[in-house]
Structure formats: structure tokens, C-alpha cells
């Protein structure tokens, strides 16, 4: 990292805080310090590697592992939803079942039909099914053929048999009054919405993390630059003081004071270097780079955007609608209500139906089986009454009810935490904006004070402690400004993550 002169530092301050003013001319001390810094001015930035905030965000979203994980997770959920929607459409299936059976009877009995024989049969069924979405049952239409071959030594009847059903239509419903399709649709829609929110949120979260690390490095660069200037300034002051001490212009106490100040500046510079190196490493890690270029130029800080016009209520509402955690919790709550409703229906008497009608004929040849078809109608009603289940059905319902209550409380807790986070972030954003304005004014005042003190010190109107105190106050004001600047941008991008605003 190359050192910079106070003129360059003031240019940086003017760039970041938009403070534009002309420096006052400094007398003797200006010439001494200026000569010391002249050889340390930075080279032209041409040839340095630059990096902007938009580039960092784009690189993080293109290269971060979490971005790929989020993309694949969303694709998986989307494919699952499309499969779910496909299963709600008409399904055409062909089912072929070969079967072999051997009947072994008592050989001592004199009944022919009880003697040993083998049966080989094959059934083929073509069926078109459709879920009846408004009611919860399933309707079907199809065609069926069965071929049976009998192998026996002594048998009456035909050794071969064909059963043909060219048309059959039916409807079945395992639990009347319960429509699982309506609940499944609600749950799957909510899960897809939650997955979409999760993917968008993950990308915004990556942008927030990238911005946080970008501004952390930008501020650490400027702190390092400031600490380097402080050390160079104190080195120059110490050299001047030692020359003056030889002719008894500076007391020994003042000389020791400058030496302490120089050591403090060296220690602060080392801390700033470690902080800047840490910020570099964190940003490079996010971008999946081994390290950032050594000749990386000073990161630019964008202009402060206009203030947001959202109220706290609007921010909370937008945060809820864009939060994947809340949307996932709503999906879990919907599924819990589904299971509670099903358990309540199964608690009492369960009624199921299966009705079908069609045409059917039996013959010993395949062709004749399709002739002289007979119309048939079959229907069954199934009643299931738990006469003695030791309270199992009731306990299942109580379990489902308790879980639903738990999910409702969990949804309320997620909503509370989101509302708290959104409200606090909005307050921090507004507070940091006010702090930025205040610290900009403080920097300007501290700079004016420093210039005046430098003139007084050069003219012998104040001691070195007063001059270094003015320098320290300027450094404190600049550090406070950078802290407010970093907090503002972190809050800005966190609010953008929460409510998805541009």
C-alpha cells in the first residue's frame, strides 16, 4: 500500500463525503510536511485493477456455491410441482398381469372339480382415470380382457376361457366427505411459492453479503490510508522536533510526546493493515478467488440513494410477502390443517363407495367373447365403524390438532421476528442517513480546525500537543464518518433483502 499526502487524503474525503472546499495555505509547517510527502505521492491509477460494487454483486451471484444450490433446489421444487399437476390430469395406463396357480385337492374324494389342476391366466386392462377434483374421488373408463388356460386330467367344461369387457365405467371414493385433492393443491401451491421466494431471497442475500464485504474493504482501505498518513506526518514532526531540540527550541517533554504519538501511529497502522487484509480475504473468499489483486485500486463508494418512503407497516407487509421462512411456515401450517381435517373425518364412521357398470361376456374363443355382450352394473358401499380402538382415532385427531396449534404459533413467531427485523432495519437506515449528514459536517469543521491549528503551530502560537490533538480529532471524525457510511449501506442492502425493493 503506497502512502499518500494530505492533499490526496483531502481529495479522498472530498470524493466520499462530497465535501468540496479549498485548503487554506499553510506556512512553514506546510512546506516541511509537503517536502517530506512529495516523493510519496501515489502513481497514476492507470494500470491498477478496479472493482465496482455491481461487479462484486454479479460475481458473487454467478460464482457462489449457495447460488447454485438455491437454483437447483428451486428447479427440484418446480419439477415436483409440475409432476403434481400432471397427476391431476387424465392418466391412461395399460396393465398386464400374468398369473399361474395350482389347485391341490383331496384325491380320495370322487368329485371331478376338486381334483388337482393348474391354471395359467393373463389379464390385460386399458384404463383411463381422472381425479374428480371437486369431490375427491376418482372416475375411470376402460376395457379389459382375460385369458385363462386350465390344465387337468379329468375335467368338465372347457380347458380355455376368455372374458371380454370392452367397456367399463366407474367411480370410487374411499372416504366420502373428504377431498384430499383440494388440500394437496393448497399445500403444493404454497410450497412452490415458498421455493420461489427462497431462490429470490438467496440471491438478494448474496447481494447483501457481497455489499457488506465490499464496503467493509472500502472503509478499511480508507482507514489504512489515513493511518499511513498519520504515521508519515508523525515521522516528519519527530524529525523536525529533533532538529529543534538540538537548538533548545523544543523541550524534552514535547519531544517525548511526539515520540509517543509516533509509536501510537505505528501501532494503529499495523491494526489497520490487519483489518484491511482480513476484509480483502473475506471478499476474495466470497468471490471464490484465491486472493484479490495486489494492485487493487481504492474501491469506489456509490452516491447515497434517495431516502425510502416506506412506512413501518408497509415494510412489515412487504417483508412477510417476500420472506421464504414465512412462506415455508405457511406451507407447514396448511399441511397441518389438512392432516387435522383428515383425522377429524376418520374419527367417526367412514363410508366409501365403488360403483361401475359395463359390458362383459365369457366364451371359450377370443372372438366370440366380444359377441352378445351383457350389460352389468356393480356397486359397493363400505362402512367402517371403530367399535373398539381404545381411543386411537381420537388420539390421532388430538395429535393433529395439537400440531396445527403448534404450527400456528410458529407462524406468529416468524411474523413477529420479521416485523421486528424490518422495523429495526428501517430505523437504522434512517438513523445512519442522519449520522452521515452530521459526520460530514464534523469532518469539514475538523479539517478547518486542523488547518488553523497547523498555522498556529507553525507560527509558534500553540504547542505540539494542541496540533496532534487537532489531527486526532480529524481522524476520529473521519472514522466516525466511515462507520456511519458502512452502517448505512449494510442497512440499505439488508432492507432490500427483506422487502425486495430497488
Describe the predicted segments one by one:
Residues 1-53:
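Bacterial Sec-dependent N-terminal signal peptides
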Residues 47-121, 176, 180-183, 187-189, ...:
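Bacterial Sec-pathway N-terminal export signals of envelope proteins
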Residues 51, 184-318, 428, 432, ...:
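Periplasmic alpha-helical coiled-coil/stalk elements that build and connect Gram-negative outer-membrane
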Residues 58-68, 75-91, 125-161, 169-187, ...:
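A glycine-/polar-enriched beta->alpha junction
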Residues 69-84, 202, 206-228, 238, ...:
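Amphipathic alpha-helical coiled-coil segments
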Residues 95-169, 300-309, 341-345, 354-385, ...:
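Small/polar, glycine/serine/threonine/aspartate-rich low-complexity segments that form flexible
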Residues 272, 324, 484:
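Metallo-beta-lactamase
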